[in-house]
Amino acid sequence: MKLLFDFFPIILFFVVYKTTNDIVTATAALIPATAAQVAFSWFKYRKVEKMHLFALVIVVILGGATILFKDDTFIKWKPSVVCWLLAVVFLIGGWVSKKNLYQRMMEANISLPQHAWSKLNYSWVIFNTLLGALNLYVAYHYTQEQWVNFKLFGMLGLSLVFALMQGVYISRHMVEDEPAPSESATGNGDNKSF
């Protein structure tokens, strides 16, 4: 359900584009959908994920420019701007604190050695940098319709494959919690034999 919630604005953008074949109309649907996502999160949970708020600001600025100038260049840059800013946040996050951003987000759920946290964090930097570049390549070398398809299916598909690869990496490097000593091992249990 959370995945659908996170991708609701882009799915709506895709559907509106496919039904109208007009990127300005699709962008005009994307802006309020992103705002509704933020508002829903606030009213339901009394908090807004920073990523959703960040996406709203970028969508309003670049989407607004797309609508104002009737130029799809701005909205085509939006995924790249988001990816590159995320890469910068992941990169700088480790420099300003003892723990990198990925570790701070995930350490409550999993335990990994420090080198694994670092590799995961840097892999997000590299992935987002490359995904942002790939988005612009598709935007400038393919048709608008192909870019819209890539924005939903290509970027989402690559993100899911990357997340699965991260899951495999994590499973290979997880630190097992020490099992609690059993009572018989500590000598505290009843050792009755019949």
Swiss-Prot record:
Main location as per UniProt: membrane
Species of the source: Hahella chejuensis (strain KCTC 2396)
Cellular-component GO terms for this entry: plasma membrane
Protein name: Inner membrane-spanning protein YciB
Transmembrane intervals: 1-21, 49-69, 77-97, 120-140, 150-170
Subcellular location field: Cell inner membrane
PANTHER family found in the cross-reference section: INNER MEMBRANE-SPANNING PROTEIN YCIB, INTRACELLULAR SEPTATION PROTEIN A-RELATED
Cross-referenced InterPro entries: YciB
Family, as annotated: Belongs to the YciB family.
Function of the protein: Plays a role in cell envelope biogenesis, maintenance of cell envelope integrity and membrane homeostasis.
Membrane topology: Multi-pass membrane protein
Pfam families: IspA (PF04279)
Keywords recorded for this protein, A-Z: Cell inner membrane, Cell membrane, Membrane, Transmembrane, Transmembrane helix
